[in-house]
């Protein structure tokens, strides 16, 4: 009886260790779909005083769920990444990592934003840190999609 209990505990520990190892390896994996987020088509958006308005019919980089694009207007200090994770949803966040200020990319297969720096901080689409070393969440901006337009409130 003692030996079968020992076997069961040993087998359970090995199984749990295997599951943990897979999860740890996933966290540190270097996704192949990293670092290729395009800039949003310049003629597809206008910058107003307190918002950016995107004409979705003129923005093929956001045409399909799982796509993302950058908006960069340095003279207004606007640096965003827009992600369309699902057919009816969009998110807009700061495009720079809170650890070292490096550019982020959307990793579609994992539904995460990844820092393009060596440390690869990962962020959830709500801006929270999924894996550091990033010390704080990303700034998130309110978005509204209606009548073929996406409005991002700054």
Model-derived features with residue positions:
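N-terminal secretory signal peptides and thylakoid transit peptides that target proteins
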Residues: 1-20
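Glycine-centered flexibility sites
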Residues: 13, 66-67, 101, 127, ...
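N-terminal pre-ligand scaffold of iron-sulfur
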Residues: 28-98, 102-107, 139-154
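Short cysteine clusters
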Residues: 97, 115-116
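Metal-associated gating/positioning segment near the N- to mid-region
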Residues: 109-113
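Exported/periplasmic cell-wall-interacting domains
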Residues: 114, 122-152
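His-Asp-centered metal-binding catalytic motifs of divalent-metal-dependent phosphohydrolases/nucleases
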Residues: 119
């Amino acid at each position: 009886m003692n030996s079968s209990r020992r076997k069961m505990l040993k087998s359970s520990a090995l199984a749990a260790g295997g599951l943990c190892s897979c999860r740890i390896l996933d966290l540190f994996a270097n996704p192949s779909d990293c670092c290729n987020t395009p800039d949003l088509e310049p003629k597809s958006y206008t910058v107003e005083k307190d918002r950016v308005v995107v004409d979705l019919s003129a923005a093929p980089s956001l045409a399909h769920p799982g796509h993302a694009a950058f908006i960069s207007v340095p003279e207004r200090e606007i640096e965003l990444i827009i992600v369309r994770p699902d057919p009816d949803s969009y998110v807009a966040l700061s495009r720079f990592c809170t650890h070292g200020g490096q550019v982020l990319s959307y990793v579609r297969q994992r539904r995460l934003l990844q820092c393009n720096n060596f440390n690869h901080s990962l962020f959830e689409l709500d801006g929270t840190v999924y894996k550091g070393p990033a010390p704080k969440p990303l700034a998130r901006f309110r978005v509204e999609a209606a009548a073929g337009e996406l409005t991002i409130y700054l």
